[in-house]
């Protein structure tokens, strides 16, 4: 009788439209209940039975119920699931398999089965890639997933690498393919094989893509020739190898090994500027005045070179600092090192006054055993030989940026616009509270940005610098020339690493067109998006493998009194994040470890400070002593506490 009653349908519709609803993201807790976070200010409680319908990170619409003045959310509609493709550990065997996602807030096993076409017989502890197939908010009874790829077995020593690469859907191996002969590019190559070119790299480097040669001119100015490996002499645009390189976009450098962008025959041999081997190169010749200024007369040309020495950073640095026993093979090589050192000092001085110089941070190198175990983590400070190469590369990239801009009007540029204009007033207000007065308009110009950076570098600590970092925009890859505020340069286009960066290969092809006086098409915008996305994924992969290895390395220090110096890098409501100075590991110090009485403790992300009873006790950039309280291997997180 009521089945088709229009009044009843109307009433139902009315009730539905009057019921309050909210859209937000589900945040799970370890206690079974959760919250629907609508925005930074508002969240609703989700009771444990309702949490069974959703997963941490799901974006949903929920009905809001109010009982006894307490609001709670009942999930109703799925907008975007948190999990689609994921990696995890398999549980159970035979017909009753489930998978636990490898995520700190996802603890529940999801029933699953091997997808059609997957041959592997899954066992307890196997690592796998899975894809979600069912979700309770889509009308399914429960969650369900398909296992789409076997990664590796539980006890594989190299789990951190294989799982991380699978998680980010990145290649595990070097590409196949071989280039049999050089292309006929119609380029005149200058024979520079008689000159004393040298390469300076880490001792273990095989893919040498830059060689340097310096000479002093009669008027006292220095002439620098930068010769760069020439993979585009072997790889035709649009070829299979080229398309593979385009997809990979970069060589992926992970702790312990790299996955090259090009086949190893090219990256480590045919293109690599090995000592005493004749190699094709793309070269740039520039003249540098005593004050470090680069003359406008910049020459790009194709060449043939033969590196006369494979030098290592530490050996060259020791020799220049009069330490150690290493000596250059002959006076010709010694003279090169001395001239390159002079160029480095004058260019560094020029950049200090006219551009910006990054503060030196050490690189951290994992020393690994044959089974992937971490034997040691070594902090490698950036020494004078590193700076020689860095100054030469920055000079060469600045030259390419100018030539491509003036001759073509496009290229692959690294662009950084400093501060987001929307943040300029807030930035000026923050600086004012610390006694620095800047004009909100001026700070958006390259000159104003450089001026501010120099003032910040002159501060006694990096605290204020860390406070304004959140106002900065990110560096981007663009086909349009534009300034790089971070380097303090009017334009910056890299071409010095074509073995490991696809964007540099593109710039090689553009520079060759300039050399030949030919027209060439502007690179497509989608290639810059691919490069930016790959750079992001590679960085995440490097961080993920690093987290795993740090957890392994520090596991036996948990609960001991071993002290580590640690720099505070971030403060949040829940505590502080610190970086261990000696090895670079990131650890978290929960608020209760800072002070037992919660009401007397204020952790302010906004101010970057921790106050106890109104007194600032800790602030970002402080270095404190900590001990390792706990290492959670399943989430690769390190929990520290201030040393007593």
From Swiss-Prot:
One Pfam short name: OB_RNB
One of the GO BP terms on file: mRNA catabolic process
GO cellular component, one term: cytosol
Record-annotated RNB domain positions: 189-516
Domain S1 motif: 561-643
Enzyme class: hydrolase
SMART domains in the cross-refs: CSP (SM00357), RNB (SM00955)
Catalytic activity reported: Exonucleolytic cleavage in the 3'- to 5'-direction to yield nucleoside 5'-phosphates
Entry annotated with the keyword Hydrolase: yes
Compartments reported by the entry: Cytoplasm
Domain of life (superkingdom): Bacteria
Keywords, alphabetical: Cytoplasm, Exonuclease, Hydrolase, Nuclease, RNA-binding
Keyword Flavoprotein among record annotations: no
EC number: 3.1.13.1
UniProt function note: Involved in mRNA degradation. Hydrolyzes single-stranded polyribonucleotides processively in the 3' to 5' direction.
Family in the record: Belongs to the RNR ribonuclease family. RNase II subfamily.
UniProt protein name: Exoribonuclease 2
């Amino acid at each position: 009788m009521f089945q088709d009653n229009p009044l009843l349908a109307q009433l139902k519709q009315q009730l539905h439209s009057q019921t309050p609803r909210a859209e937000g993201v589900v945040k799970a807790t370890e206690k079974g209940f959760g919250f629907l976070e609508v925005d930074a200010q508002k969240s609703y409680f989700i009771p444990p039975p309702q949490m069974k319908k959703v997963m941490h990170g799901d974006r949903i619409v929920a009905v809001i119920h109010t009982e006894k003045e307490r609001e709670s959310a009942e999930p109703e509609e799925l907008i975007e699931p948190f999990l689609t493709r994921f990696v995890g550990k398999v549980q159970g065997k035979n017909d009753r398999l489930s998978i636990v996602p490898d995520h700190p807030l996802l603890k529940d096993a999801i029933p699953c089965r091997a997808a059609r076409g997957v041959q592997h017989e899954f066992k307890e502890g196997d690592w796998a890639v899975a894809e979600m197939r069912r979700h309770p908010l889509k009308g399914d009874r429960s969650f369900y997933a398909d296992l789409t790829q076997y990664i590796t077995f539980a006890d594989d020593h190299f789990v951190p690498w294989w799982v991380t690469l699978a998680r980010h859907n990145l290649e595990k191996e070097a590409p196949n393919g071989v280039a049999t002969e050089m292309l006929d590019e119609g380029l005149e190559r200058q024979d520079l094989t008689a000159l004393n070119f040298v390469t300076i790299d880490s001792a273990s480097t095989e893919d040498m893509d830059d060689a340097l040669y310096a000479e002093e001119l009669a008027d006292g100015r220095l002439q620098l020739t930068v010769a760069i490996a020439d993979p585009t002499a072997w790889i035709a645009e649009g070829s299979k190898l080229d398309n593979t390189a385009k997809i990979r976009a970069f060589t992926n450098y992970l702790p312990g090994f790299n996955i090259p962008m090009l086949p190893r025959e090219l990256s480590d041999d045919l293109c690599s500027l090995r000592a005493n081997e004749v190699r094709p190169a793309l070269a740039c010749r520039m003249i540098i005045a005593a004050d470090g200024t680069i003359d406008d007369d910049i020459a790009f040309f194709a060449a043939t070179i033969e590196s006369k020495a494979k030098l290592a950073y530490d050996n060259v640095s020791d020799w220049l600092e009069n330490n150690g026993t290493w000596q250059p093979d002959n006076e010709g090589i010694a003279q090169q090192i001395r001239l390159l050192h002079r160029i480095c000092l004058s260019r560094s001085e020029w950049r200090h006054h006219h551009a910006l110089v990054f503060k030196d941070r050490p690189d951290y190198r994992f020393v690994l055993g044959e089974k992937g175990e971490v034997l040691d983590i070594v902090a490698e400070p950036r020494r004078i030989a590193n700076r020689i190469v860095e100054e030469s590369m920055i000079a060469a990239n600045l030259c390419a940026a100018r030539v491509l801009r003036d001759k073509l009007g496009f290229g692959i540029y690294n662009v950084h616009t400093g501060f987001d204009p929307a943040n300029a007033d807030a930035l000026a207000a923050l600086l004012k509270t610390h006694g620095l007065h800047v004009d909100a308009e001026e700070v958006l110009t390259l000159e104003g940005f450089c001026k501010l950076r120099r003032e910040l570098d002159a501060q006694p600590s990096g605290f204020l610098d860390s406070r304004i970092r959140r106002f900065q925009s990110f560096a981007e890859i663009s086909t349009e020339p534009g300034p790089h505020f971070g380097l303090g340069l009017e334009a910056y286009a890299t071409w010095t690493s074509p073995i490991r960066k696809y964007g540099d290969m593109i710039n090689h092809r553009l520079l060759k067109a300039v050399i030949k006086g030919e027209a060439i098409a502007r690179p497509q915008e989608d290639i810059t998006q691919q490069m930016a996305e790959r750079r992001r994924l590679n960085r995440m992969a490097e961080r993920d493998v690093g987290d795993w290895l740090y957890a392994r390395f520090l596991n036996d220090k948990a609960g001991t009194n071993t002290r580590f110096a640690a720099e505070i890098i971030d403060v949040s409501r829940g505590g502080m994040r610190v970086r261990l100075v000696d090895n670079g590991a990131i650890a978290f110090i929960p608020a209760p470890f800072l002070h037992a009485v919660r009401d007397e403790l204020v952790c302010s992300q906004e101010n970057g400070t921790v106050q106890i009873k109104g007194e600032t006790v800790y602030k970002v950039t402080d270095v404190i002593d900590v001990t390792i309280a706990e290492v959670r291997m399943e989430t690769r997180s390190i929990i520290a506490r201030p040393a007593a």
